[in-house]
């Protein structure tokens, strides 16, 4: 995966596992929908039908954003993924991938049908289901990715985020000061971060994964493979219009004076199977109020409603950092305007943007830089940065360092590199599914 090559790995945390897990979830949703339909779609099961539709849409969304290119002007030509709407009744069925445009149209249809049916009253543990706010947060993210040439999608992002955030978003954001005040040792901060009772967490999902063993700075693997001083300079140790790293409520983990980087947010839990054998799993907040706020800020920016965008950015930074100064559109613009664009030799947080839509130089671009920077901090090691890289056509490099000296650039992924769509699992291709194209 590091080399952007196809992997034959089929174990936990592989593309194969993600593909299977998503389609298993889709199969469950389709079975529920079929059973409800067989009963005549009674009103008493409307909420369950709504959640099944949202679950089906979400799992196809995960697959599309992983194995397809970002939605854009070529979406009607780019390869999609099979959108399954019925329970499977045959062995080894053959499906067409369709196009990205068709996948997004189907997701939108499922969302719009399912959203008004969601009813939180049917759940005993609301945060472990696609409750109303979680469903609308998903809709906000989806329509942000479903970019239209005239940005008509952005008003839907705003409308749906408003349902999540209400009239005073600040009261629903994570209490980062309280999280940062907790001990960074043991699992105290991560357990608090994923707590379903936290007001910011809208949907908490469990997943069979060893990812926290790599991403948690409490483990040596993080420093070696995931986050070090070089990468931290662009994320958890970076400076923004809110100040330097000392302004963050949650500081990079540094027990015993040893160098550690990254915020402690995810932790691995062990489920013992037999003897000393165990399976790792994790909990993570798939949707949060903070992320919904940044979705809205980005939509405001694309619509050139800069004062409203700056107000959302300011609300986020006052929760996430210790900075008490109000950020205006002017202060945000000035900060990112003076930064140089990233190069492998001189990295900065400001990357050249090459989206499949038009953004203006100056205020609009610099507000986008700020939002991408904030989202990178907010969702560090949770996977959303990759979506921003794809959506904004950010060029990324594979760099070889000796100590802190850049020795060589071993690979480069350009804006239109087909490897931005991760290759389908080898077993899926062997079974007859059309693979993603490659240049070699």
Language model: regions and residue ranges:
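Conserved, well-structured interaction surfaces
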Residues: 2-68, 94, 98-102, 111-123, ...
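Inward-facing hydrophobic residues that define packing positions of alpha-helical scaffold repeats
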Residues: 26-29, 104, 111, 154, ...
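Short coil/turn linking the two alpha-helices of tandem helical-hairpin repeats
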Residues: 64-71, 122, 145-151, 302-304
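Short coil/linker segments at helix-helix boundaries
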Residues: 66-109, 150-159
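Hydrophobic-face positions in mid-chain alpha helices that act as interaction patches
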Residues: 154-290, 323-358, 378, 384, ...
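C-terminal substrate/ligand-recognition segments
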Residues: 285-306, 312
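C-terminal functional modules
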Residues: 355-440
């Amino acid at each position: 995966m590091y080399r952007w090559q196809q992997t034959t790995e089929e174990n936990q945390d592989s593309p194969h596992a993600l593909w299977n897990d998503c389609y298993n979830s889709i199969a469950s949703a389709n079975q529920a929908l079929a059973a409800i339909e067989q009963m005549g779609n009674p009103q008493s099961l409307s909420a369950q039908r709504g959640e099944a539709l949202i679950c089906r849409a979400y799992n196809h969304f995960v697959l599309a954003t992983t194995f397809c290119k970002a939605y854009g002007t070529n979406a009607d030509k780019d390869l999609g993924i099979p959108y399954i709407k019925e329970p499977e009744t045959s062995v080894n069925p053959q499906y067409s991938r369709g196009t990205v445009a068709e996948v997004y149209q189907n997701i939108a249809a499922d969302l719009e049908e399912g959203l008004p049916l969601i009813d939180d009253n049917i759940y005993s543990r609301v945060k472990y289901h696609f409750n109303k706010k979680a469903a609308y947060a998903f809709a906000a993210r989806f329509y942000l990715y479903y970019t239209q040439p005239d940005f008509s999608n952005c008003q839907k992002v705003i409308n749906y985020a408003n349902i999540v955030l209400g009239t005073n978003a600040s009261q629903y954001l994570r209490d980062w000061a309280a999280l940062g005040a907790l001990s960074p040792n043991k699992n105290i901060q991560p357990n608090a971060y994923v707590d379903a009772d936290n007001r910011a967490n809208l949907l908490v999902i469990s997943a069979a994964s060893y990812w926290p063993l790599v991403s948690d700075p409490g483990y040596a693997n993080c420093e070696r493979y995931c986050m070090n001083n070089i990468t931290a300079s662009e994320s958890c140790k970076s400076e923004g219009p809110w100040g330097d790293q000392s302004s963050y409520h949650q500081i990079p983990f540094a027990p015993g004076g040893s160098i550690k980087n990254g915020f402690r947010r995810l932790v691995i839990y062990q489920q013992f199977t037999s003897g000393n054998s165990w399976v790792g799993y994790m909990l993570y907040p798939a949707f949060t109020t903070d992320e919904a706020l940044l979705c809205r800020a980005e939509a405001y920016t694309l619509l050139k409603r800069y004062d409203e965008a700056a107000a959302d950015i300011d609300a986020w930074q006052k929760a996430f950092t210790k900075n008490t100064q109000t950020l205006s559109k002017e202060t945000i613009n000035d900060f990112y305007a003076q930064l140089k664009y990233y190069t492998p030799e001189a990295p900065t947080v400001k990357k050249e943007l090459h989206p499949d839509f038009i953004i203006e130089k100056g205020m609009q671009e610099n507000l986008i830089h700020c939002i991408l920077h904030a989202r990178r901090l907010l969702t560090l090691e949770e996977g959303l940065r990759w979506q921003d890289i794809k959506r904004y056509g950010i060029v990324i490099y594979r760099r070889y360092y000796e100590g802190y000296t850049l020795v060589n650039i071993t690979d480069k992924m350009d804006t239109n590199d087909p490897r931005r769509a991760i290759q389908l699992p080898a077993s899926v291709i062997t079974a007859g599914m059309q693979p993603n194209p490659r240049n070699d």
